[in-house]
Amino acid sequence: GARFRGLKRQLVGVMQGGEPVKQQNTHMQLHPALRTEEDGLTLNLKPFFYDKVDGGSPRHKMWSRQEPGTPIGHASGEPYLEIIAAPAVVSSDTTLTISWNRMATWEEKEVFIDFCIKHDGDSEYRPAVQQARITLPIRLTEGKEQHINFAPLADVKKGVKSIPLAASSDSGLKVGFYAESGPVRVEGDRLVFEKMPPKAKYPVEVSVVAWQYGRTGENPVKTAEPVRRTFLIYE
């Protein structure tokens, strides 16, 4: 737009395992591998500025208006990660953490972590955005099995603020939770109740899922069968 007229263009990307993720001639352009830490959840992805125009995707040439291989500068500061839509959250400047939510159903084959690398620009350079996609199989099928133990949840009365959530896996890996239905949200290991709609018909059903994704790599663990617990809120 007009407000960026006269500003230089900059290009951002992401590194995985110390190497830039290759630009590809696809809609998302960057396709990092599903490569997690020992916890099976943390993805190390370091945003960076390109120092020359990349030829892997025609968009670099289009965005920069320069031929591939041409040196290119960038603004001060660092680019950052932002989630577009995903069962994941940004957990630090250089990590995403898989965090299952009701966006993914366990009946599908795969789900995508769509994220972007951004820099807001400065007085010399215009903002830069680069999207990327990690493909996540809904279930990891290699490695040893694991099973979740998640005790049933008791019914509650309206007005309860929160209840603790406790579940474990025989793999020793940490179990996560998400709210599948009902006026609730998960915050860490607690289920927090939101304000009830004034016309709510009691009892109101709540459904919570405990999950453990497993891990890839040298000691692979399969995805656990998710355990769903349902309870009621009474007036």
Task: Tell where the protein language model's regions lie, with residue ranges.
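Solvent-exposed beta-strand/loop surfaces, strongest in extracytoplasmic domains of secreted
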Residues: G1-E235
